[in-house]
């Protein structure tokens, strides 16, 4: 893909205001990035906190970081998925080295859990 792709996104422009579905530009995938055609997306409590102002969020913000879909394109250096693969998105990347990751349970990544709880 060359140039930006037009896509729809749920955009928060101001806390306490409704999200607006807008057409936005999406750059092609960069190094270690994957372009996914979203089939389903969830809005979770952290999105609610951003929208209500309960957590500091740079605005405007695209909400709905939980999702699944099909890989459309991969950037340089991506070897774990190929176009056509069905994927579930993770908002916090797994380290790939801890006991949970090496035993096939990246959703329980010790590093990711620590980062989520402590921010470190």
Residue spans of the language-model regions?
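Short cysteine/histidine-rich metal-coordination sites, predominantly Zn2+-binding motifs
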Residues: 57-59, 112-120
């Amino acid at each position: 893909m060359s140039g930006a792709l037009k896509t729809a996104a749920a955009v928060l422009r101001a806390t306490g205001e409704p999200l607006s579905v807008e057409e936005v530009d999406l750059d092609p995938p960069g190094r270690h990035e994957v372009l996914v055609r979203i089939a389903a997306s969830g809005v979770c409590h952290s999105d609610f906190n951003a929208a209500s102002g309960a957590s500091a969020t740079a605005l405007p913000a695209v909400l709905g970081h939980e999702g699944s879909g099909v890989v459309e394109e991969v950037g340089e250096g991506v070897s774990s998925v190929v176009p056509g693969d069905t994927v579930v998105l993770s908002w916090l990347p797994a380290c790939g080295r801890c006991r949970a990751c090496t035993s096939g349970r990246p959703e329980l990544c010790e590093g990711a859990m620590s980062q989520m709880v402590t921010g470190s």
